[in-house]
Amino acid sequence: MEKKRFFEPWIPEKYNEGINGKKILVFGASYYCKEVNCPYYKDCTSVEKKDSSLYDKRCPSYIASNRCLHDEPSYTTDGARANSNFARLFSPYVKDGEDIWDYLAFTNYVQFFLPCSKDDSGKVSSAPTLPEHLSPRDFDAFIEVIQEQKPDVVVIWGTVIAEPIRDRQNNPFIYDLDECFDNTEGYICHMNIPNVDHDIVLFNCYHPSSRSWNESFEDAARYLDVLLKR
C-alpha cells in the first residue's frame, strides 16, 4: 500500500518507555527549504503541487551529506528555537541532564517542503504555515503515522494544523470537542482511531515559536501536568 506520509518521523530510543509511561508523538507544522538557488527549488517547494518526493534522492544539499529529503526530522531535532522552547514544557518530567527529545517522537504535519522568502538584503527566512499550504493528504498522513506509532498522546503545535484535526467534518475519529473547550480551554480532547487499541489524547498548544506560546505557557504547563499524571 502506498504511504500517505513523505517524511519519516523521528522515533527516539526511549519513545516506547515514554514519559510517565505515556508514549508521546509531536506534530509540528512544516519544514522549509532555504536553498533558494537550487535548480529544483521552485518545483520542490511548489505550494500548488505540494509534493517534494520527486527530489527525495536528487537534492544537491542532501546528496552531499548522503541523506534523503524524507529523512527529516532526523536532522532537525537539535538547536531550533521552537524545539528548545517546547522542551522547556516537558523538562519537569525527565531527570536533570536528560534530553527530552530522547523520549518524544516528532514529525511535521505538512508533507512537503515549504518555500522560504528572500528579502532585499538577500536574507532567507521562513514564514508562518498558512491554511492554503495544507491538503487532505496531510491529514491522511497524520492518521497513518498515529496508526504506525500508536502513541498515547499526540501533541499538536499551533492553530493552523489544529483546524483540520479538530474539524468534525474532516476528522470522524474525534469525539469530545465540546468537552475539550468547556473543560480544558481547548487543550485536551480525544480520538478513537482504527487499528489503535486505545484512545488517543490530543494536546493542542500554541506553536513554540509564536508569541502566544510564552503568553499561554503556564496554562499549557498546567493542563499537561493533569494529562501526564493521570
Regions found by a protein language model. Give the residues of each.
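C-terminal capping/extension of enzyme domains
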Residues: 126-143, 162-230
